[in-house]
């Protein structure tokens, strides 16, 4: 991301709109800067003084924003032959760690909305998310049911432990057009 003010303001607004907190960068007086987090209705705090989840979460959501609003438009997503020029993969390992369930749910919604946005723009952006978060999984299903995300845009692979007597190591689950999980193991979330 360039240091251009419009990019900074765009990022700040996107975070505020999608995650209901604000970020700000302030000089600290020692030649350094402080990254401030302000949750809705609360006082702003230095990143080091808020929950550990923010320090893990911010790089992830900045990467998503940068990919769809800076990288993809600059890559000219489609050439004259209607072929995708550049693929972007964003990998996430347990993004729910240290996050409040409300932020997990918002992340799930943003992932689903980003997939729909990229499909509409013909951007080749793919996410690989390893998660155990019921909030993320349910938010994606809700986006399918309520906001029209194509369920074929989401693949779910379940990795089973053969040592626990499971027949298959990898099984595929999926969402119905109504956002319901299909072929989901009974008791997985309980």
What are these regions (language model features)?
Residues 3-8, 13-14, 21-184, 189:
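Switch/communication elements of ASCE P-loop NTPase nucleotide-binding domains
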């Amino acid at each position: 991301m360039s240091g251009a003010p419009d990019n900074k303001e765009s990022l700040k607004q996107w975070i505020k709109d999608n995650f209901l907190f604000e970020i700000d960068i302030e000089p600290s007086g020692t030649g350094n800067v402080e990254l401030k987090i302000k949750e809705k209705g609360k006082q702003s705090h230095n990143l080091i003084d808020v929950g550990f989840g923010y320090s893990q979460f911010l790089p992830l959501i900045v990467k998503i924003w940068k990919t769809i609003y800076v990288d993809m438009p600059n890559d000219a997503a489609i050439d004259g032959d209607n072929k995708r020029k550049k693929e972007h993969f964003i990998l996430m390992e347990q993004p729910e760690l240290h996050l409040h369930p409300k932020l997990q749910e918002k992340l799930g919604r943003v992932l689903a909305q980003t997939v729909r946005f990229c499909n509409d723009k013909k951007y080749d952006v793919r996410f690989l998310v390893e998660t155990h978060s019921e909030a993320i999984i349910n938010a994606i299903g809700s986006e399918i049911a309520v906001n029209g995300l194509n369920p074929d845009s989401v693949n779910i692979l379940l990795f089973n432990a053969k040592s626990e007597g499971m027949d298959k190591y990898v099984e595929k689950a999926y969402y119905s057009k109504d956002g319901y999980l299909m072929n989901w193991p009974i008791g997985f979330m309980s």
